[in-house]
Amino acid sequence: MSSEREERTFRSSPVQQDDVRENISNENQEHPSPNPPSYASSMAESQTLLPKRPIIGGQTAKLQNKNRTSVHVAFADLPRDLPEIPDGISDRRRVHKEQQHLGLDTTPPVPPRPLSRLRDVNSHDKLPSIRSPRNLNYQPSVRSSRSGSIFDDAPSMAPPGGSYVSYGMHDDGSPQRPWTPSSRVSGFTRSDLSRPPPSDGMYEPSDLNGSPRPGTPSSRYGGSPRRPLPPAPLFSNSRQPVPPIADDATISIPLHDTYDDDVFAPESDLSDARPHPVDRSSYMSSESQDTLNEGDMEDYDKVEHYGPAPTGAQERRGVRAPQMSRKEVQLINGELVLECKIPTILYSFLPRRGEVEFTHMRYTAVTCDPDDFVERGYTLRQTFGKTVRETELFICVTMYNEDEIGFTRTMHAVMKNISHFCSRSRSRTWGETGWQKIVVCIVSDGREKIHPRTLDALAAMGVYQHGIAKNFVNNRAVQAHVYEYTTQVSLDSDLKFKGAEKGIVPCQMIFCLKEKNQRKLNSHRWFFNAFGKALNPNVCILLDVGTRPSGTSLYHLWKAFDTDSNVAGACGEIKAMKGRLGANLLNPLVASQNFEYKMSNILDKPLESVFGYITVLPGALSAYRYHALQNDETGHGPLSQYFKGETLHGQHADVFTANMYLAEDRILCWELVAKRGERWVLKYVKGCTGETDVPDTVPEFISQRRRWLNGAFFAAVYSLVHFKQIWFTDHTLARKILLHMEFLYQFIQLMFTFFSLANFYLTFYFVAGGLTDPKVDPFGHNIATVIFHILRYACVLLISTQFILSLGNRPQGSKKLYLISMIIYSIIMVYTTFATFYIIIHQLTSKDDKIEMGDNVFTNMIVSILSTIGMYFIMSILYLDPWHMITSSAQYFILLPSYICTLQVYAFCNTHDVTWGTKGDNVMKTDLGGAVGKGETVELEMPSEQLDIDSGYDEALRNLRDRLEVPESPPSESQLQEDYYKSVRTYLVLTWMIGNGILGMAVSEIYSARGIGDNYYLRFLLWSVAALAVFRAIGSTTFAVLNVINMIVEGRVRLSLKAPRWMGGLKERVNDKMSSVSSNLRS
């Protein structure tokens, strides 16, 4: 019976009989091990359940065919320090049998686990293990922490080495993966092999595309298709948590101290990590000694695992991109035009829903130049269907990369102005439906430059929708994306919705998103030549994003054109945005600009309006009569000259013209007034005001003034050179005389601007040098002389430094240097102002010198101060706006040297730079996809597919294989242009610098610093300043008087004057005379 039992044992064992029979028989003779009767049958059953297929791979121990005798056994080299097997039955087994006999065995059975396999690189050093099928009744080992195993009654074999990687024991709560090697075992259909019920924890679904999660927004929109969601944790439902591991390698430590009498006692691992699975059939196969590691790896690759951790920013869970689909669309006149429904949420609270303009947003992909917009058959909603309307007022809002705060500030103010138009119920032009005569056009310069939040604001108003724009239509590049919608809601600067309950009326909006960044001049060409030509409006208003017009400003601008048919352009008052309670005025830079803007609107603009020619209508808030802008039959006119600067290239471009177009708002002014055969005039409207942001940092301030100063200088030169064009206009003789007086005034101003640097130095030299006289020295001990020489040398060095900085450094890269220079200039100005007032006070209190009005220092100083500061106060009070004199005048006078030196030096040294600080975008983008089709039908494709990426890669490989030579490109037009402008810049800077240097050195050598009374040049300088100030005041006063007369004539101020009866018809004759005088002044 013993031999038969051994025969059955060897027949069932996975080890080769010929190789191990002798070792096992010897061990059984010394220490016989009791075998349970069911052992052989259990092993036979396990062999029938496992498939027997060969797998090729690396070397390890396997079952061999019985007829093969000379085969190397992998576990022959066992460790030499194995524990010795004791004689007889062990104490542990004896105690275990006694507990079984008495029924005291309380060891809980462990549920069966799925079949697995062990994986180890050094498999030839390990003893092959055997795992029995599930749910078989085995006798458990003594005091074992796990259920009974087949090893409890296995033949006596040596334990594995210390490098053996044990199988991590898991609870039955571990979910079964969708595919594992154990699933290949046929015949297992028991419930213990099925996946356990889901746990209570919430985690991402295991579906690749991300199925919805309960209780999250993704249950409505679905998961994100861009990122595969990880499956549920492997041991989410296990009863015992698995501790984290630091390494995949595990170390097996035999517990000899506790189970020194049991060779097959359980081993403890330092790590509970689950090792890599190994195919169990490799141990049960009897065909080859070689296992197939490659096949094992193929099986392992099919096992689902977590994968690497995602890198970079991840999308918010529950939100995904809109699903795109392909649709066939019918072209309209060969062009792509789409009518898109507005969002449901926006539609839900609209008060008006009866027309398509309220329920659908219209998208047009424009593939032509703006000059060909109408000729190519493009239309706007106001030109066809039920929405055919006459456009009275066309408003243009240009923007580049401004944020949503600046955009909503401007747009909400515009919509409140439209509400004011509709509130004028007694007007013959406006009224309740007045909004139908107003169209607002927003032109954005560059699709990739626009601020994303600004697009969000437009989308909230219903004007813009993401995902419908295309880069090309039938292989024609799209130049601009045009969105049309009549919105009924507005967003204020606090990003709060305002609707009909706040008085907001519908607003017809056109949003033109240019594909490329081509500067502001091109944006105006889209407005005037494309949309203006299609709508043919009466008045066009230009606004910049960030400017906030007051509630009635646009009405006052339009009214100026309605009351005077000779007005071709008008502008309002630009105010600096002072912030809440004037907090921005704490910044000296903002305060100085506030003073400058105020005095320009009090002195300069009214004077120029009296003459009829305003040198600059600010683009931030101005208006033009569209009919006056049109070209004549030969194509020459204001618009042709205005857009001439957009096509200047290379050395053929005129540097004066290029710089003049930096201040493009000055060009239309001259072209309108000097238009042949017309009598157009420009007007300043005092009732129109608009607030705008001003630069609050030094680099931004210098860059802005560089454009303004160069544009103003070259535009003034252009108008003075071409002043003869006025002779060919239809202006009256009186108007032509007034215009020539203005040209003379501009010429004098231009000369003072050109020599302002030398005049500043000479003023400082003579005034501050006047304190060096020991009789006048306020400090004594020649301290004033030391201070004067220090400041004099500092001024000369500072001016020289300004040239070096301006020629080689950008303001953004030299913030501290420019700031330090402005601080030193302020110190020089403060000392010069102190010297001026001290000299005047010394003359008043001196006993030796008599106070006389005449040719002396006292008279010259008093006249100069009263003509500047005094005149500023008087005119500000006359216009009932004196507060800037209190809050901002000191900051302006302190920073005045910086205006003269820093700004003008930088401007003249950068006349070669004719850009706005941005470069044109000439690269064709294809990120939006295109509309491709045949005939009148196109198919809208999704963005780039994998096939497109592969084709581009293949083309690159073919170019490398064929070694295609890249031709050398000639010098670019931009490089030629830059070289030419730099040469002109050098000549201009040299001329300007030498001229100012000669004047300063000559006058300083002729007149000493102490002889102020005999200084004729200083006398001329002071009296010239006074004369110019008085001239400006006269013009401003004339404007105010004419306004009063105009109010009287129009009946807004009624005078009830009763004449005596004996005077007869004198009253009627006086009224007729006043009417005739008013009509002559208007002409």
Swiss-Prot record:
Organism whose genome encodes this protein: Fusarium oxysporum f. sp. lycopersici (strain 4287 / CBS 123668 / FGSC 9935 / NRRL 34936)
Glycan-modified residues: 23, 67, 417
Region span, Disordered: 1-248, 260-294
Enzyme class: transferase
Keywords (A to Z) from UniProt: Cell membrane, Glycoprotein, Glycosyltransferase, Membrane, Transferase, Transmembrane, Transmembrane helix
InterPro entries named in the record: Chitin_synth, Chitin_synth_fun, Chitin_synth_N
Bias (Basic and acidic residues) ranges: 1-10, 18-30, 78-100, 117-128
Functional description taken from the UniProt entry: Polymerizes chitin, a structural polymer of the cell wall and septum, by transferring the sugar moiety of UDP-GlcNAc to the non-reducing end of the growing chitin polymer. Plays a critical role in cell wall integrity and virulence.
Protein's recorded name: Chitin synthase 2
